Amino acid sequence: MSLPWWRARFDLTLHEAKQDPNARIVWLGDSITEYWQRQGGHGYDDVLPVWQRDYAPYHALDFGFIGDTTSSLIWRLDHGEVAGLHPRLAIVLIGANNFGATHWGAAVTVPGIEAVVTDTQRHLPHAHILLLGVLPSIRSAWITAQTAATNAALARVYAHNPAVTFMNVGPVLERDGHADAALYVDPHLTPPEPALHPDAEGMARIAAAIAPVVRKYAGAP
């Protein structure tokens, strides 16, 4: 929490929350969520137009942070990030970084995500929670296995919870049951990196997949 850029972004989110207290949707997550604001100029990485089309009409707030784990997100929630907000819908997408440098598997990540959901409910008691499963990536066989185990467990945990909708949107990013590298930004980088962050088409597919739930709980734009 002491990295200058991280602290600067946290301060920015606090400011944004005060500037737009009537936001009807709040996105909470890591770099994948932060990528909603990406406008790289190459087409495949121009994600911002999707956000402007699907979420800006809701005065949605994007609280995604590069590198954040479940623990980091809980810290943000507990230090005032959503204070004063009363959204109808909170969309949570977290967990990918648990499998990275920290090497936390499903056994740690599932309760971590459950803690994020509980904390979000505590700070945003009137918001419905749309919990997205950890997205597929092409990083390692171990991460792929942990992703599948995490999503299966979360589906069971929230199967009958009226306050939480769990959705595994991973299949919209897959081809033949595996992450489709053609739908990710990372392979386009120089040098190429393993597929982790969906590109503009991938994010548009996610937005389309969750649109019925967004309309159900956040209403019409």
Predicted segment positions?
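A structural signal for short coil/turn segments at secondary-structure junctions
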Residues: 20, 55, 124, 161-162
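Generic structural signal for well-ordered alpha-helices
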Residues: 113-118, 151-155
